[in-house]
C-alpha cells in the first residue's frame, strides 16, 4: 500500500484566512498538536515575510522533533537565506520555494519571459541545495499553465536538485479529471520524475479541493498539502482530515494510507477552531458536530439495529468521545495536573498553579467540569502571554423588557489607570460594546460576533469570538466565561489588545529594517 505524506500548511496558508492572526504561543500550540496528529511536514510560515514569522518558524523548528518543519520562500536568495537561519536547527530542515508559471502570472505579476522564469527557478533550487537536504519546488498557478512549458520547467528544477515537485491549484480552478491528467502528463513527459515526489496543493474556490487531492493520489501523487478544517485564503484549502479519513475508509479503492493518528483529528480540529476563531460548520464532514447525528426516523432505526447501515465512520475513529465529567470541586491539584497532561498540554508549575485557581473558581459555580471546560481554561489563560494594553476589571449591565439596556465597564490601561464608562444600546451586547468603545476612546468597528457553548447544560461556559477593525486593520479575539456578556467583553478587549500587539510588532520590524 502506498504511503502518502501529509504536508500541513495550517500555520502558513491557513493563517492567511481573513481576520486570523495567531501569536507565537498559539502557533507553537498548534504545531505541537500537529506533531501529535502525525503529519509528516509542517509548513510553519514565511520566514522572510516578517520578524514575527521568522521567530515563529524558528521556534517551531526548534520545538518539533517527530516531523519535518519547512518554510516558504520566493525564488530570491535573501528569502532562502532567511529560511535557512530559521530552520537550520530543525530535526529535518527543508525548503519550499516557488515561482509562478502561468502565462497570466508571468506577464502581469512577474513581468518575466518564460525563459527568465525557468532560469530563476533553476538558480533558486541550486542555491537552496547548498543549505537544505530537501528542497520542494512549487509552480504557482500550475493548473493554468501551458503543460509543455510546465513539463520543461519541472524537468529543469529536478536536474537542479529539487526533491519534491508541487503542482498547486492556486485559484481552485481545476476539476478532478483535469488535475489528475496534469500529473499523468508530467509522469509521461518529464525525465527523472520517478526520482522525486509529486505533491498536490488544492484550493477550494469551486468546492473541489478534497476531490482534486484524491484525484492527484490516483494519478501518482505521494504528498498532499492542506489545512486543518480546510481553512485558508478565500474559500480555503483541502481539509487534511477529510483526505486522511477518505483514504482510510476507502483504502480498498485508493490503496494508499497516511501515518496520521486519526484519533487526534477531533482534538486538532477543535484547537485550530478555538485559536483562529473560525467555527467549524455543524455539517462539516468528519469534524462537524452533526457529522455523526441522525435526525431521520428511518436512519435512527437503522443505526440502532446496526450502525453500519448509515454510519460509515465511527465517531471514535476520529477521536469524538462523550463529554463525560472528569473533575469536580473536590478534585486536587495532582488530579488536575494529570488530566491536563492526558489532554496533551505541557504546563509549567506556575501555569498549573494559576490555572488551578481558575479551575476551583469555575468548579464552585459549575457542577460538572468537562475536558472542553479545561481546554477552554487553558487556551484562555496560557496562550495570551503578551503584554495587555487594556485589562477588563468589571462589567455591570442592566436590562429589562421595558427598559433601555445600560452597561457600565471598568478597565485598567497599560499604566494601571482605571477607566470607567457607561453607555446604552438597543440590546445588552450593544450597550456593553458602546461602553467599551467610549472607555477605549477608539473608533473600533465590530465586524463579526459569534457565540458557542463549551459543553452542554444550563451551566455551560460561553465562548465568544469577535472580529474588529480599527484604521483599516483587523484582529480577532475570543473570550470565555459562564456569563455571555462577560465572555463578550473579554473577546472585545482581547481583539483590541491583539491589534495593538500586531501594530507594535510592525513598528519594531520597520525600525529594525532602517
From Swiss-Prot:
Mn(2+) binds at residues 13, 201, 203, 237. It is found in: Cytoplasm. The keyword Thylakoid does not apply. Residues 4-266 form the Pyruvate carboxyltransferase domain. Residues 391-514 are annotated as: Regulatory domain. Homodimer. GO terms for molecular function: 2-isopropylmalate synthase activity; acetyl-CoA C-acetyltransferase activity; manganese ion binding. It is an enzyme of class 2 (transferase). Gene3D superfamilies: 1.10.238.260, 3.30.160.270, Aldolase class I. The keyword Nucleotidyltransferase does not apply. Its cofactor is Mn(2+). Its main location: cytoplasm. This is 2-isopropylmalate synthase. Its EC number is 2.3.3.13. It comes from Anoxybacillus flavithermus (strain DSM 21510 / WK1). It catalyses: 3-methyl-2-oxobutanoate + acetyl-CoA + H2O = (2S)-2-isopropylmalate + CoA + H(+).
Amino acid at each position: 500500500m502506498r504511503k502518502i505524506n501529509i504536508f500541513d500548511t495550517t500555520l502558513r496558508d491557513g493563517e492567511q484566512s481573513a481576520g486570523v492572526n495567531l501569536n507565537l504561543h498559539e502557533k507553537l500550540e498548534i504545531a505541537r498538536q500537529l506533531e501529535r496528529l502525525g503529519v509528516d511536514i509542517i509548513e510553519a510560515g514565511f520566514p522572510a515575510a516578517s520578524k514575527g514569522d521568522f521567530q515563529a518558524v524558528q521556534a517551531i523548528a526548534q520545538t518539533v522533533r517527530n516531523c519535518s518543519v519547512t518554510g516558504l520562500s520566493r525564488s530570491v536568495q535573501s528569502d532562502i537565506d532567511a529560511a535557512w537561519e530559521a530552520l537550520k536547527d530543525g530535526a529535518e530542515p527543508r525548503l519550499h520555494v516557488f515561482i509562478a508559471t502561468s502565462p497570466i502570472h508571468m506577464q502581469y505579476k512577474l513581468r518575466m519571459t518564460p525563459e527568465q522564469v525557468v532560469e530563476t527557478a533553476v538558480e533558486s533550487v541550486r542555491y537552496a541545495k547548498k543549505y537544505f537536504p530537501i528542497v520542494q519546488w512549487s509552480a504557482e498557478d500550475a493548473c493554468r499553465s501551458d503543460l509543455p512549458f510546465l513539463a520543461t520547467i519541472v524537468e529543469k528544477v529536478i536536474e537542479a536538485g529539487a526533491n519534491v515537485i508541487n503542482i498547486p491549484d492556486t485559484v481552485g480552478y481545476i476539476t478532478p479529471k483535469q488535475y489528475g491528467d496534469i500529473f499523468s502528463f508530467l509522469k509521461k513527459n518529464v525525465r527523472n520524475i520517478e526520482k522525486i515526489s509529486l505533491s498536490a496543493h488544492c484550493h477550494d474556490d469551486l468546492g473541489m479541493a478534497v476531490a482534486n487531492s484524491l484525484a492527484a493520489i490516483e494519478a501518482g501523487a505521494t504528498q498532499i498539502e492542506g489545512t486543518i478544517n480546510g481553512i485558508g485564503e478565500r474559500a480555503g484549502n483541502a481539509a487534511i482530515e477529510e483526505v486522511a479519513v477518505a483514504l482510510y475508509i476507502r483504502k480498498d479503492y485508493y490503496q494508499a494510507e497516511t501515518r496520521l493518528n486519526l484519533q487526534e483529528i477531533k482534538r486538532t480540529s477543535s484547537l485550530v477552531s478555538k485559536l483562529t476563531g473560525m467555527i467549524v460548520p455543524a455539517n462539516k464532514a468528519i469534524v462537524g458536530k452533526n457529522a455523526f447525528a441522525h435526525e431521520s426516523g428511518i436512519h435512527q432505526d437503522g443505526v440502532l439495529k446496526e450502525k453500519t447501515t448509515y454510519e460509515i465512520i465511527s465517531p471514535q475513529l476520529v477521536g469524538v468521545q462523550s463529554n463525560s465529567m472528569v473533575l469536580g470541586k473536590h478534585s486536587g491539584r495532582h488530579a488536575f495536573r494529570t488530566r491536563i497532561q492526558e489532554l496533551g498540554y505541557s504546563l509549567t508549575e506556575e501555569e498549573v498553579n494559576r490555572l488551578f485557581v481558575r479551575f476551583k473558581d469555575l468548579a464552585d459555580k459549575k457542577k460538572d467540569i468537562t475536558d472542553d471546560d479545561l481546554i477552554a481554561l487553558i487556551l484562555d489563560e496560557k496562550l495570551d502571554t503578551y503584554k495587555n494594553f487594556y485589562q477588563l476589571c468589571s462589567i455591570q449591565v442592566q436590562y429589562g423588557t421595558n427598559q433601555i439596556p445600560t452597561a457600565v465597564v471598568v478597565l485598567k490601561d497599560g499604566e494601571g489607570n482605571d477607566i470607567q464608562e457607561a453607555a446604552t444600546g438597543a440590546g445588552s451586547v450593544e450597550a456593553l460594546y458602546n461602553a467599551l468603545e467610549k472607555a477605549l476612546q477608539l473608533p473600533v468597528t465590530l465586524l463579526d460576533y459569534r457565540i458557542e457553548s463549551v459543553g452542554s447544560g444550563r451551566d455551560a461556559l460561553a465562548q465568544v469570538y469577535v472580529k474588529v477593525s480599527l484604521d483599516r486593520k483587523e484582529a480577532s479575539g475570543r473570550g470565555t466565561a459562564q456569563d455571555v456578556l462577560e465572555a463578550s467583553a473579554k473577546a472585545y478587549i482581547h481583539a483590541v489588545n491583539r491589534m495593538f500587539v500586531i501594530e507594535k510588532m510592525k513598528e519594531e520590524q520597520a525600525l529594525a529594517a532602517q
